């Protein structure tokens, strides 16, 4: 059976969770989260996880599954998500992928190759080389695998090192190996609204995070875990950690959270516009819910017919 996955994405703060709750009133759905930070336990406020009431209304998967200091990547996400997807279908429910992490979306719709084992020696050498000559790894990637370089952000050292590791270990480009693992068809629904409205929602959400206890959440985390973890470089956490370290005041920290979140939302939209056949809706428009319910129902009916 050729499964057509349903993905609902959009910039942070646009209202994906709120819309999903509304859709659940019409369809028997379960959500597979596509948020690379909501997978971590104890990081609730700063990652804007669904609240207990929303989680009660709609079953969510891939939230609170690992500790902040545990290793996780897009390959593991893809593997776990597909198993959960099968279980949801067996229960007669509709699996809906929801979130804005581009790497997870790529893992599902483009495939994500991870067959080459990690080589810590190569990784250490590459990291050392990068420290000695900043920017050299980017140049190497552009030379060895231009296609991968075009997809990987210049500041994304994790993916840069992984791509170079695969090439140095196998002599093959990771971009070519990934093409061997193409995923099935998908329907990508993108939520977006007027930029001024989106930015205002982001600003208000940042203030509410502080009101709801983000500072205490960060304090508890860095008491239990190393504050230099990559996990804590997440927007909202890194700024509060710097505030707690006395680098700047709370007002500046809040300003930076707002600004950095707006910049992140803009990058998400740039990424999502690459998908030519995506379907875009404004979640604030009254007819949006009905249209998306129709789309999901159509895919689900098609799936049911294929099973018959």
From Swiss-Prot:
Binding site for ATP: 10-17
GO biological process, alphabetically ordered: tRNA modification
Record keywords: ATP-binding, Magnesium, Nucleotide-binding, Transferase, tRNA processing
Pfam families: IPPT (PF01715)
UniProt catalytic activity: adenosine(37) in tRNA + dimethylallyl diphosphate = N(6)-dimethylallyladenosine(37) in tRNA + diphosphate
Transmembrane segment boundaries: none
Top-level taxon of origin: Bacteria
Residues that coordinate or bind substrate: 12-17
Span list, region Interaction with substrate tRNA: 35-38
Assigned EC number: 2.5.1.75
InterPro entries for this protein: Dimethylallyltransferase, IPT, P-loop_NTPase
Site-annotated residues for Interaction with substrate tRNA: 101, 123
Keyword Nucleotide-binding: yes
Keyword tRNA processing carried by entry: yes
Subunit structure: Monomer.
NCBIfam families: miaA
Protein family (similarity comment): Belongs to the IPP transferase family.
Functional description taken from the UniProt entry: Catalyzes the transfer of a dimethylallyl group onto the adenine at position 37 in tRNAs that read codons beginning with uridine, leading to the formation of N6-(dimethylallyl)adenosine (i(6)A).
Protein name: tRNA dimethylallyltransferase
Gene symbol of the encoding locus: miaA
């Amino acid at each position: 059976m050729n499964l057509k996955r349903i993905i609902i994405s959009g910039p942070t703060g646009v209202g994906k969770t709120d819309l999903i709750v509304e859709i659940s009133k019409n369809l028997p759905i379960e959500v597979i989260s596509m948020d690379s930070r909501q997978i971590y336990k104890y990081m609730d406020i700063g990652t804007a996880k669904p609240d207990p009431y929303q989680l009660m209304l709609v079953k969510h998967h891939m939230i609170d599954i690992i500790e902040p200091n545990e290793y996780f990547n897009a390959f593991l996400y893809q593997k776990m998500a597909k198993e959960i997807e099968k279980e949801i279908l067996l229960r007669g429910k509709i699996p809906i992928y929801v979130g804005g992490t581009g790497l997870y979306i790529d893992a599902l719709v483009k495939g994500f190759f991870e067959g080459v084992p990690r080589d810590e020696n190569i990784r250490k050498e590459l990291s050392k080389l990068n420290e000695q000559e900043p920017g050299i790894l980017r140049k190497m990637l552009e030379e060895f695998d231009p296609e991968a370089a075009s997809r990987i952000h210049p500041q994304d050292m994790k993916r840069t090192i992984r791509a170079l590791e695969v090439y140095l270990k196998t002599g093959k480009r990771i971009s070519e190996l990934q093409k061997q693992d193409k995923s099935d068809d998908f329907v990508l629904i993108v939520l977006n609204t007027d930029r001024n409205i989106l930015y205002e929602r982001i600003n208000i959400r940042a203030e509410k995070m502080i009101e709801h206890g983000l500072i205490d959440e960060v304090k508890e985390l860095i008491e239990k875990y190393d504050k230099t973890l990559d996990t804590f470089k997440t927007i909202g956490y890194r700024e509060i950690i710097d505030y707690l370290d006395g680098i700047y005041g709370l007002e500046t920290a809040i300003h930076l959270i707002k600004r950095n979140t707006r910049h992140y939302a803009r990058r998400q939209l740039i990424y999502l516009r690459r998908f030519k056949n995506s379907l875009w809706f404004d979640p604030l428009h009254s007819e949006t819910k009905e249209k998306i319910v129709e789309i999901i129902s159509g895919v689900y009916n098609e799936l049911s017919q294929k099973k018959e």
